Regions:
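N-terminal "domain-start" segment
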Residues: 55-321
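N-terminal, immediately post-signal peptide pro-regions of secreted/luminal proteins
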Residues: 17-68
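Cleavable N-terminal signal peptides of Sec/SRP-targeted secreted and luminal proteins
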Residues: 2-16
Length: 349
């Protein structure tokens, strides 16, 4: 009996090694396709299908262990991530950002201003984005989400099947990019073994960024989500909330719904982007005295950085670095639907 048990355990170990080896071989074989597909914008292709195969192969290993709940995952990352981890992984994410757009857009800072000033120190637009940039492999599905929301926090919003498809398309697209692969590998290294499964990655990002919650004090209207606040803008009475995306701001400028008054301060991120603090008027009358945003960075890099800091340093300064330039991301959280979610997130320097 003992001999049979020993033989059974040996076979189990061998099978586990074979499964892990198979997963590694599959992933290495599709890396060229992942890079190519991120450039050619092909959706539902063999690379995506093979990623799902990785999920099922590695999932065979994960299923033998107890999967962590959402709350347990957040606590695990928060407790196990060191300050040095954050500096290292942020450098890695920036270096992996192949869809950086800084060299393809025009940024016209013009005059300096202050949060209290009402003077227009910038007669021209802040950002000019050429059409080919809007059609970029990750920017196109990102911008497709802009018309899915209404800026008023008490106006009801209902997610249609098409809008949910657009959410998943965006998530699938960015999961094939360098910054998001770095994030998922980092989460696995912190003990979140289920992040080896592709569908688990999709569900995590969908939960963090697209779970609907109420922002108004009545709590009656689930009219907001993290994506809408961070990457777009919301209005609560006359107060502008969010608006930390340079792409959304550029779109508002194109539509003549944003008037850039000038910049307050800026930080150069070693040629890979800027962090800009600026003053603008939205929708002709809504004052946004101190907006902070990355400029030129890709949607996937920003999503990866904000997700990292939400999980590792919620409600605290998340100190990062690129090319020896230090900066911080500040996240604020709220509890809704019995979940800890992103209230807002933005860069600070």
């Amino acid at each position: 009996m003992k001999i049979a048990l020993i033989l059974f355990l040996c076979v189990g170990v061998a099978l586990a090694d074979d499964i892990a080896s198979a997963a590694g071989q599959i992933f290495n074989s599709i890396l060229p396709n992942l890079i190519s597909n991120s450039v050619t914008r092909q959706q539902g292709n063999s690379a995506t299908n093979t990623l799902q195969q990785i999920g099922s192969v590695v999932g065979g290993v994960v299923d033998y262990a107890k999967k962590k709940s959402y709350e347990e995952m957040l606590k695990q990352v928060q407790d196990s991530t060191t300050d040095e981890d954050l500096l290292r992984i942020s450098e890695e994410m920036f270096n992996a950002d192949l869809n950086n757009a800084l060299n393809y857009i025009q940024v016209n800072l013009q005059g300096k201003t202050s949060p209290m000033s009402k003077s227009d120190e910038a007669p021209s637009s802040l950002i000019n984005v050429p059409e080919n940039v809007w059609n970029g492999p990750t920017i196109r599905p990102f911008a497709a989400l802009f018309d899915n929301y209404h800026k008023n926090v008490i106006r009801p919003e209902f997610v249609t099947p098409n809008e949910e498809t657009e959410q998943v398309t965006y998530i699938n697209t960015i999961l094939a990019t360098g910054p998001m692969r770095s994030l998922m590998n980092f989460l696995v290294s912190k003990g979140l073994n289920q992040m080896n499964e592709y569908q688990e990655q999709v569900e995590l990002l969908k939960k963090i960024w697209f779970t609907k919650y109420a922002r108004h004090w009545t709590g009656l209207c689930k009219c907001s989500c993290a994506f809408e606040n961070v990457f777009m803008a919301e209005l609560k009475s006359n107060e502008v909330l969010g608006l930390h995306s340079w792409l959304f701001f550029a779109k508002r400028e194109m539509d003549r719904k944003a008037n850039y008054l000038g910049y307050i301060d800026k930080l150069d991120l070693g040629g890979k982007g800027l962090i800009l603090k600026q003053h603008s008027i939205l929708s002709e009358t809504k004052d946004a005295p101190e907006l902070t945003m990355f400029v030129g960075t890709s949607p996937e890099l920003e999503t990866a950085l904000y997700t990292l800091c939400f999980m590792a340093r919620p409600d605290r300064p998340c100190k990062l670095r690129f090319n020896n330039v230090p900066f911080t991301i500040q996240t604020k959280t709220l509890k809704a639907e019995n979940l800890i979610l992103i209230d807002t997130a933005y860069p600070v320097f």
